[in-house]
Amino acid sequence: MQYKKSLVASALVTTSLAAYAPKDPWSTLTPSATYKGGITDYSSTFGIAVEPIATTASSKAKRAAAISQIGDGQIQATTKTTAAAVSQIGDGQIQATTKTKAAAVSQIGDGQIQATTKTTSAKTTAAAVSQIGDGQIQATTKTKAAAVSQIGDGQIQATTKTTAAAVSQIGDGQIQATTKTTAAAVSQIGDGQIQATTNTTVAPVSQITDGQIQATTLTSATIIPSPAPAPITNGTDPVTAETCKSSGTLEMNLKGGILTDGKGRIGSIVANRQFQFDGPPPQAGAIYAAGWSITPEGNLAIGDQDTFYQCLSGNFYNLYDEHIGTQCNAVHLQAIDLVNC
């Protein structure tokens, strides 16, 4: 697979020209193109699972991994997963693990979203991603089914080498997931970041006040019953995967092309090209804050693009809409219905 070889520095320079200033109408921060056949309104709450593009032709199961969110809104996911769900932490960031077989991405409190890498099959026993307080989303690596939680800053983190890991959310919105899990669920912390543990089989993740989402390691997984699919407001429902919803799981809503998390923060592509949740309004310098859709294939898209990149940051990955470095892998963010189990 061919990747774009752009430098982070050059990306920051070129994108800063159209960056969002706090007084600007952020709802107009949309890409110039739209995804053909994409759904811009979805009537049900849904999560996302990270599916590496190299393995999207593998299994198309009915149950996928949800991503959690931590408090800061960041979202992170694991790598080499089969079906890992990502959580969200408080800052809104989303992060996922690495070397998972199906890793879902979580969200932490600051709204950032991160997903795992090298995942194989999601949609059957997939992992949901959690959110931490800052909105970032992060996932672990080498998990087989790691769930990601959410911490207060919104970051989301998830594990790696997971088969079905759910990600939680922490307070900052970041999303992170664990690594080497088989089916770990991630919780949410206050900043929105989402983080998950490593070496877990199925570990549920909790949420801390900053929104970050973190999950334990060396846990085991359970089978999820199959409820009715979620309704949509236009077109044919493209979402064919589902996973159990738990505390801290990254929960998203799509209305009029605007993506929000469970705390009402805005899903955006920020100045460094990272996907996270902030605000409202989105953080200063944001590039896109609208123009989201679900593709006919069931993937999350921004504009006419449904390819995202999970880039290694320590023991987790952050999610970006562009290839920003050598340790980045192309992924799809698969939409999955969240059900009460």
UniProtKB/Swiss-Prot annotation:
The record marks R63, A64 as: Cleavage. The keyword Acetylation does not apply. Covalently linked to beta-1,3-glucan of the inner cell wall layer via an alkali-sensitive ester linkage between the gamma-carboxyl group of glutamic acids, arising from specific glutamines within the PIR1/2/3 repeats, and hydroxyl groups of glucoses of beta-1,3-glucan chains. O-glycosylated. Extensively O-mannosylated. Residues 19-63 form a propeptide. Residues 1-18 form the signal peptide. GO terms for biological process: fungal-type cell wall organization. It is found in: Secreted, Cell wall. PIR1/2/3 repeats lie at residues 64-82, 83-101, 102-120, 126-144, 145-163, 164-182, 183-201, 202-220. Coiled coil: none annotated. Keywords: Cell wall, Cell wall biogenesis/degradation, Cleavage on pair of basic residues, Glycoprotein, Repeat, Secreted, Signal. GO terms for molecular function: structural constituent of cell wall. The record marks Q74, Q93, Q112, Q136, Q155, Q174, Q193, Q212 as: Covalent attachment to cell wall glycan. Belongs to the PIR protein family. PANTHER family: CELL WALL MANNOPROTEIN CIS3-RELATED (PTHR47254:SF1). Component of the outer cell wall layer. Required for stability of the cell wall and for optimal growth. Required for resistance against several antifungal and cell wall-perturbing agents and for tolerance to heat shock. This is Cell wall mannoprotein PIR1. It comes from Saccharomyces cerevisiae (strain RM11-1a) (Baker's yeast).
